[in-house]
């Protein structure tokens, strides 16, 4: 089925885990960066930017792996935390999956991952920020029970144009109401 392999880069404590997935994570990030980043994402050294992103996520960066083939399906990480690491209130989820897994496989994995995060980390709320034109991700979020919370008009610049951003979220309480989750 699937496994969530935590990727850790902790230079301060000299701890590194599952770095063998980083070349594939890097490849996915480059392939789909137009869906992930705005014009303010300035990375002269994209490899260093990935390492910094993994390290900044504070142990909340995962390779999502097909456990039968050990093939990378995608990755997920959290940022913009509210609370502290002993008492997490909310965070923003970011994901990217290889195209061959888009559709029902991503939906299955996403459902498992959201359940895993609520159960194991005690989040009260998980948020997602989506570029307005990313219809596929918005549909996925809605199918998982996320609700649109806000439209931030002209929130950023993408392709030298003002870009609207939508915020979606789901709370632990809402997730508990869904029969087979948590």
Question: What kind of feature is each model-predicted range?
Answer:
Residues 34-37, 100-101:
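Short, polar/flexible loop-turn hinges at active-site or ligand-entry regions and domain interfaces
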